[in-house]
Swiss-Prot record:
HAMAP family: CPSase_S_chain. This is Carbamoyl phosphate synthase small chain. Composed of two chains; the small (or glutamine) chain promotes the hydrolysis of glutamine to ammonia, which is used by the large (or ammonia) chain to synthesize carbamoyl phosphate. Tetramer of heterodimers (alpha,beta)4. It catalyses: hydrogencarbonate + L-glutamine + 2 ATP + H2O = carbamoyl phosphate + L-glutamate + 2 ADP + phosphate + 2 H(+). PANTHER family: CARBAMOYL-PHOSPHATE SYNTHASE SMALL CHAIN, MULTIFUNCTIONAL TRYPTOPHAN BIOSYNTHESIS PROTEIN-RELATED. Its EC number is 6.3.5.5. Pathway: Amino-acid biosynthesis; L-arginine biosynthesis; carbamoyl phosphate from bicarbonate: step 1/1; Pyrimidine metabolism; UMP biosynthesis via de novo pathway; (S)-dihydroorotate from bicarbonate: step 1/3. It comes from the Bacteria. InterPro entries: Anth_synth/Amidotransfase, CarbamoylP_synth_ssu, CarbamoylP_synth_ssu_N, CarbP_synth_ssu_N_sf, Class_I_gatase-like, CPSase_GATase1, GATASE. The gene is carA. Small subunit of the glutamine-dependent carbamoyl phosphate synthetase (CPSase). CPSase catalyzes the formation of carbamoyl phosphate from the ammonia moiety of glutamine, carbonate, and phosphate donated by ATP, constituting the first step of 2 biosynthetic pathways, one leading to arginine and/or urea and the other to pyrimidine nucleotides. The small subunit (glutamine amidotransferase) binds and cleaves glutamine to supply the large subunit with the substrate ammonia. GO terms for molecular function: ATP binding; carbamoyl-phosphate synthase (glutamine-hydrolyzing) activity; glutaminase activity. It comes from Mesorhizobium japonicum (strain LMG 29417 / CECT 9101 / MAFF 303099).
Length: 398
């Protein structure tokens, strides 16, 4: 019999690149994954977070202690192709996952993680891990789950130390759509679920660097036929589709690596008068195309409670964020205006091209999960299109 004071044998490990070993209880997929560790401060929306393609190459530490209480369902998914498993490769929880209790629950988080191939662990001090990230930055690590508790610790340490990290890594090519498609699903409505678009009134081409479903839903809900194209689609092919607007999506990895093929395309598109709107990685792509620079952040911004100031209105919005790279505002050339800034650290959160229908934001106005303070940006984009077509403007805020 095991003595009451004996330490429980761990069935999961988080091994950091500096050799630190954190022991926990495993759940989700068995095996291991090497990635960068970040933390997310959102209280809700764990399915949307873990399926957001922007988290590719990352292990998400949830600062809220109770994750999984409402189970999982087939609707709260953000990646376009769940079979491709675009999104986080690992997850770290404080409390053990309990049986779900929610009218929408269709399954247990543990089983859902297994199906998604996400390696997870629970039962650790997530506050201490978050403090470590805040102090030292986002570490490279290996997360491993073995139900029998048998690990090759030397191998795990070697893999964690050897991984080069996200700098220079183009992950958009790993999570983008394989072929063009048309999106017609509209936002979720209480007691009705998601809708189906009827007759679209305008055409938006969305370049998919790892786009989230809710972005596409909001565009469709405003009357846009949304054609989603792979990240490496050329400008001639895009322009041949005769879009009324161009959307540059969110996505994972180093923007400068993705920019090798994405920036020339965006620069060609900017030679036209077609309105352009970018979010997250798309924001960074636009900044690079305009001559700016990006840089890796110390701890990144991941959560649903970030204050951002809109310089154009003077208002403060609470927004969702998910990025580990940021645009260097000092690198922006003349004619590019900084429109939004983070009130946490002063980093750039938005730009606009003076006198042109071109703008982007670093944060996620579609939320999912998170507040809807910035939903008006989708209406602003559609209004730029409608203005160009001589059509009546939508109310920007409803």
């Amino acid at each position: 019999m095991t003595p009451a004071w004996a330490t429980e044998k761990p069935t999961a490990l988080l091994v950091l690149a500096d050799g630190t070993v954190i022991e926990g209880r495993g759940l989700g997929a068995t095996g291991s994954a090497v990635a960068e560790v970040c933390f997310n401060t959102a209280l809700t929306g764990y399915q949307e977070i873990l399926t957001d393609p922007s988290y590719a190459g990352q292990i998400v530490t949830f600062t809220f202690p109770h994750i999984g209480n409402i189970g999982t369902n087939g609707e709260d998914i953000e990646d376009l192709n769940p079979a491709a498993r675009a999104g986080a490769v690992g997850a770290v929880f404080k409390a053990d996952v309990t049986n779900p209790s929610n009218y929408r629950a269709a399954g247990h988080l543990d089983q859902w993680l297994k199906k998604r191939g996400i390696v997870a662990l629970s039962g650790i001090d997530t506050r201490a891990l978050t403090a470590l990230i805040r102090e030292k930055g986002m570490p490279n690590a290996v997360i491993a789950h073995a139900p029998d508790g048998v690990f090759d610790l030397d191998d795990l340490k070697q893999r964690a130390a050897a991984w080069s990290g996200l700098i220079g890594l183009d992950l958009a090519k790993e999570v983008t759509s394989g072929q063009s498609s048309v999106w017609r699903e509209t936002p979720w409505v209480w007691n009705e679920g998601f809708g189906e678009q009827a007759e679209p009134s305008l055409h938006v081409v969305a370049i998919d660097y790892g786009v989230k479903r809710n972005i596409l839903r909001l565009l469709a809900g405003l009357g846009a036929k949304v054609t989603v194209v792979p990240a490496n689609t050329g400008s001639e092919e895009i322009l041949a589709m005769q879009p009324d607007g161009i959307f540059l999506s969110n996505g994972p990895g180093d923007p400068e690596a993705t920019g090798d093929y994405a920036v020339p395309v965006i620069q060609d598109l900017l030679k036209t008068d077609i309105p352009v709107f970018g979010i997250c990685l798309g924001h960074q792509m636009l900044a690079l195309a305009l001559g700016g620079r990006t840089a890796k952040m110390h701890q990144g911004h991941h959560g649903a409670n970030h204050p951002v100031k809109d310089h154009t209105t003077g208002k403060v919005e609470i927004v969702s964020m998910n990025h580990g790279f940021a645009v260097d505002a000092d690198s922006l050339p003349e004619g590019v205006e900084e429109t939004h800034v983070s009130l946490f650290d002063g980093s750039n959160c938005g730009i606009a091209l003076t006198g042109r229908p071109v703008f982007s934001v670093q944060h996620h106005p579609e939320a999912s999960p998170g507040p809807q303070d910035s939903h008006y940006l989708f209406r602003r984009f559609v209004n730029l299109i409608r203005e160009k077509r001589g059509e009546e403007q939508l109310a920007e805020r409803v």
